[in-house]
From Swiss-Prot:
PROSITE patterns: SER_THR_PHOSPHATASE. This is Serine/threonine-protein phosphatase PP1-gamma catalytic subunit. Its main location: cytoplasm. The modification N-acetylalanine is found at A2. Binds 2 manganese ions per subunit. It catalyses: O-phospho-L-seryl-[protein] + H2O = L-seryl-[protein] + phosphate; O-phospho-L-threonyl-[protein] + H2O = L-threonyl-[protein] + phosphate. One of its GO terms (molecular function) is protein serine/threonine phosphatase activity. Its EC number is 3.1.3.16. Protein phosphatase that associates with over 200 regulatory proteins to form highly specific holoenzymes which dephosphorylate hundreds of biological targets. Protein phosphatase 1 (PP1) is essential for cell division, and participates in the regulation of glycogen metabolism, muscle contractility and protein synthesis. Dephosphorylates RPS6KB1. Involved in regulation of ionic conductances and long-term synaptic plasticity. May play an important role in dephosphorylating substrates such as the postsynaptic density-associated Ca(2+)/calmodulin dependent protein kinase II. One of its GO terms (cellular component) is cleavage furrow.
Length: 323
């Protein structure tokens, strides 16, 4: 446990932020024992907090980042670096982009520094069988070693799975599950755990909404299901919720509504993989649960960032008075 005891979080965050303003792509090479310490300490914190987080607004919610470190820095510049704002990230920190290590290290460092104000959910890429293939394993092996990748795996296996904001907004990476009847089922999932090939945990990280599906449908991903608008409406009604907030799919404007604004998809990696001309978005939830969207245009476009008008959820949602 020496790695944890000697961890200088402020120094690590400072070095990770030093590349602000540099040409995108410049690496920050932390010491291996520092990264190991980040994994071990954050793992402790994840396990000390619920697998189904109960959070309070105001906070900012972000979708997939996928190793696009300089876009993550732009998100923080736009939304406010912690602790100026509270954050909830919906998973998929690693793979595909060029700087998964910087991305996950900064996020874990902020989790350690501000454990009650900064929250990270698990995405389907925080899973050994996926990030072994899509880039994170290769990045760890090239810049450090395979043992460090395995340390990250142990950390990812302890991430929380879902969050509920002020008893009204249900957040997860993928979507709903035909197995999900009670929130208690999520709370009963034991950590550490890998992501199974099917079932509740798999679906929460993998499923997608589909406007052409009635009920539950098959998916092109070959994992989990798609679900229609009626499934969303029934779920919200049953659990007295107002909105599902999820990530997992590239959307052109960085956010996209579904099922009469009862579900929103967030994607926070602009110009994803350099192949899509998508914007990235972050959803700000204020104390009254009014939601607005902050948009990151692809960096190459050199257009100013735009703020979309405030969007009420299904009319105006009033924040529950604290008992």
């Amino acid at each position: 446990m020496a790695d944890i005891d000697k961890l200088n979080i402020d120094s690590i965050i400072q070095r990770l932020l030093e590349v602000r303003g540099s040409k995108p792509g410049k690496n920050v090479q932390l010491q291996e024992n520092e990264i190991r310490g980040l994994c071990l300490k954050s793992r402790e914190i994840f396990l000390s907090q619920p697998i189904l987080l109960e959070l309070e607004a105001p906070l900012k919610i972000c979708g997939d980042i996928h190793g696009q470190y300089y876009d993550l820095l732009r998100l923080f510049e736009y939304g406010g670096f912690p602790p100026e704002s509270n954050y909830l990230f919906l998973g998929d920190y690693v793979d595909r982009g060029k700087q998964s290590l910087e991305t996950i290290c900064l996020l874990l460092a902020y989790k350690i520094k501000y454990p009650e104000n900064f929250f990270l959910l698990r995405g389907n890429h925080e899973c050994v069988s996926i990030n072994r293939i899509y880039g994170f394993y290769d990045e760890c092996k090239r810049r450090y070693n395979i043992k460090l990748w395995k340390t990250f795996t142990d950390c990812f296996n302890c991430l929380p799975i879902a969050a509920i904001v002020d008893e009204k907004i249900f957040c997860c990476h993928g979507g709903l599950s035909p197995d999900l009847q009670s929130m208690e089922q999520i709370r009963r999932i034991m950590r550490p755990t890998d992501v199974p090939d099917q079932g509740l945990l798999c679906d929460l990280l993998w499923s997608d909404p589909d406007k052409d599906v009635l009920g539950w449908g098959e998916t092109d991903r070959g994992v989990s299901f798609t679900f229609g608008a009626e499934v969303v409406a029934k779920f919200l009604h049953k659990h007295d919720l107002d909105l599902i907030c999820r990530a997992h799919q590239v959307v052109e404007d960085g956010y996209e509504f579904f099922a009469k604004r009862q579900l929103v998809t967030l994607f926070s990696a602009p110009n994803y993989c350099g192949e899509f001309d998508n914007a990235g978005a972050m959803m700000s939830v204020d104390e009254t649960l009014m939601c607005s969207f902050q948009i990151l245009k692809p960096a190459e476009k050199k257009k100013p960032n735009a703020t979309r008008p405030v969007t009420p959820l299904r009319g105006m949602i009033t924040k529950q008075a604290k008992k």
